């Protein structure tokens, strides 16, 4: 593999286009070898999602982490994967949801894959995401903090008592924070460094990283850097705390120094960015909770698009809250509005992109406004949909459930409305889902603060939204529905209502 990063490589198996054996077969074979501590997967596609789930569950039970680098995620990459292997790589969102469901850590580059496997091989996964960074440079401390901001890792501050213990090992010229710049006053003094490192590591954090870049040539006298690594190892042994050495760049820890770090029971991680990815991946594995097996899916031969009004009637019958509405010709619009009650929303049917065509008017408060809207709206033979307008609105949310063969039923949640594509704030799950799954996914959205009372606004009824998603998903899985998109679901202070719906079903005609 040509890697020179200190990874203990036991086996390498290639399955080509998986015409005979698949990646799941290779994983199953490796799990029979009790010497295997972690398994990396470089794959373009999963041949059988249910078989993959089976071996992933087995790996989790045996405590053998899986790390996946899946290619073909872009449009160009998928085209290459298709021509190269004969199997479509599939949508990235579906694969990410599959890996997340079974606790498979994901990475994006070969370097991240190697660093993650190296960390998992030497000490296993992490129980949490709280980390400490130590360095003798404020610039390195800032660099680590900036790069970690793109991850789910947390630099939790030291408590008052913990800070006092650390300060007792330092001069008054050094201030204590996390990330921690310990300066160089103690440089080369193994005992002094060990006391400070031990005080830092004697706390509740999950792992401590020491940023250390050593001179590459013997004539540059790297002895004092070995002292720093030994001091970290001494502190780790004394406290029982997990610690790693991190180089700013991969070139900053040479082979002899890597070997020494490994001999002392530590992991040398090469490159700050790759190291943080590895730490995050180890926490993903360590915090995984077993989930029920996801529902299998088959691709339909033919599909048909159901009109919005019919789609809403079907959704209403499934228990999804939709506005009270009537489908009527132009001449009956006023009477239909009187039946559902003002304010009303008027939609011209038979058009694919209603908003762009000026075929949607929301919040019409009386007959005068309704008639004015009707006169400016395009008319079609399909007529008009007159609905009650939802006035209790805290947030607009996108909810989609679709078959994503060969993986499973993909549930997507995101920032909804006409700006969905612009914000691209979406997270994904595989069905079946629970209310807790849905609420956890919503918390991962960048727009999550809008659901919790942003700038004095009321909080959204997340319980009602989660109930809607669970009810919809349970009804769709295993049915003739191929895809249902609710955009938006209007979530109020009380309740959640789907005001627009797209429904695609199997067509057996």
Residues of each region from the PLM?
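Catalytic-core regions of core metabolic enzymes
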Residues: 1-509
């Amino acid at each position: 593999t040509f890697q020179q990063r200190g990874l203990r490589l036991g086996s390498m198996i290639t399955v080509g286009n998986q015409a005979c054996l698949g990646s799941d077969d290779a994983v199953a074979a490796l799990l029979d070898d009790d010497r295997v501590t972690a398994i990396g997967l470089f794959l373009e596609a999963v041949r059988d999602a249910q078989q993959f789930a089976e071996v992933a569950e087995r790996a989790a039970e045996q405590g053998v982490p899986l790390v996946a680098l899946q290619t073909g995620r872009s449009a160009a990459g998928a085209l290459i994967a298709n021509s190269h292997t004969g199997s479509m790589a599939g949508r990235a969102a579906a694969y990410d949801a599959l890996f997340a469901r079974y606790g498979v850590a994901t990475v994006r580059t070969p370097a991240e894959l190697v660093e993650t496997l190296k960390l998992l091989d030497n000490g296993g996964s992490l129980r949490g995401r709280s980390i400490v960074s130590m360095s003798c440079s404020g610039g390195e401390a800032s660099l680590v903090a900036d790069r970690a901001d793109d991850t789910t890792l947390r630099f939790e501050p030291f408590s008052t008592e913990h800070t006092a213990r650390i300060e007792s090992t330092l001069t008054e010229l050094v201030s204590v924070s996390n990330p921690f710049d310990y300066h160089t006053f103690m440089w080369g003094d193994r005992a002094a460094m060990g006391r400070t490192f031990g005080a830092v590591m004697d706390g509740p954090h999950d792992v401590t990283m020491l940023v250390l870049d050593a001179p590459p040539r013997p004539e540059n006298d790297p002895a004092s850097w070995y002292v720093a690594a030994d001091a970290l190892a001494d502190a780790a042994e004394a406290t029982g705390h997990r610690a790693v050495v991190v180089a700013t760049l991969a070139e900053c820890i040479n082979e002899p120094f890597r070997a020494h770090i490994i001999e002392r029971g530590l992991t040398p991680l090469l490159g700050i960015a790759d190291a943080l990815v590895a730490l995050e991946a180890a926490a993903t594995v360590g915090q995984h909770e077993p989930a029920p097996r996801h529902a299998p899916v088959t691709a339909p031969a033919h599909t048909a698009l159901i009109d919005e009004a019919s789609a809403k009637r079907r959704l209403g019958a499934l228990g999804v809250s939709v506005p009270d509405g009537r489908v009527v010709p132009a001449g009956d619009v006023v009477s239909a509005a009187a039946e559902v009650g003002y304010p009303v929303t008027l939609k011209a049917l038979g058009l694919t992109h209603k908003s762009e065509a000026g075929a949607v008017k929301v919040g019409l408060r009386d007959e005068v406004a309704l008639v004015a809207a009707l006169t400016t709206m395009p008319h079609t033979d399909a007529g008009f949909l007159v609905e009650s307008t939802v006035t209790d609105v805290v947030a607009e949310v996108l909810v989609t459930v679709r078959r994503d063969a060969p993986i499973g039923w993909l549930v997507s949640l995101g920032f909804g409305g006409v700006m969905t594509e612009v914000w691209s704030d979406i997270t994904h799950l595989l069905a079946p889902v629970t209310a807790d799954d849905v609420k956890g996914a919503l918390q991962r959205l960048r727009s999550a603060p809008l659901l919790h009372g942003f700038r004095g606004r009321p909080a959204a009824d997340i319980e009602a939204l989660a109930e809607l998603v669970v009810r919809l998903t349970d009804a769709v899985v295993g049915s003739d529905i191929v895809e249902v998109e609710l955009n938006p679901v209007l979530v109020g202070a009380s309740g959640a209502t789907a005001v627009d719906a797209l429904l695609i079903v199997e067509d057996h005609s």
